[in-house]
Amino acid sequence: MSHPQTSENPAVIPAGMKQLNLLAGFMETNGPLWGRLHEDDGLPVMGFRVELRHCNPMQICHGGMLMTFADMLLGFTCGIAAGGRKFMPTINLTGDYVGPAPLGAWVEGHGRLIRQTRNLSFAEAMITADGAPCLRTSGIMKIPSQETREGNVLALFREEHR
């Protein structure tokens, strides 16, 4: 049975997703990333469509791209959980590759906050490719002592679709 949001129909972006305005630097090269705030917990759900430029020679999404996506997802999860106005540098990021994300697949993750202290934020996610697990990830982010100009991560999820 073919689902409309699979590698068989790469143009489909899931309903409710908005393109995140990450138009500078590293993420401009690796995006676009899509996102929305989860209706139950207000934390980010993010995704991207695997393109050829994301793939290894076997036309499977490169592990480096999956970890880049995980870093963004967990960083935004921690940032939003802390009020949405702080950019959170990564202290530690781990990942276990549990399945492939083939060319054309829709890769998606929903961050989950585990714990927050005064200085650190801990999060995890199971990232899927067309609904099947592909990367289990966890991370520790540093909570900065003050808000940063470029740290309003919550605003990224509230902007109009571009």
Task: Describe each region flagged by the PLM.
Residues 1-162:
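Terminal targeting signals and extreme-terminal segments of soluble enzymes
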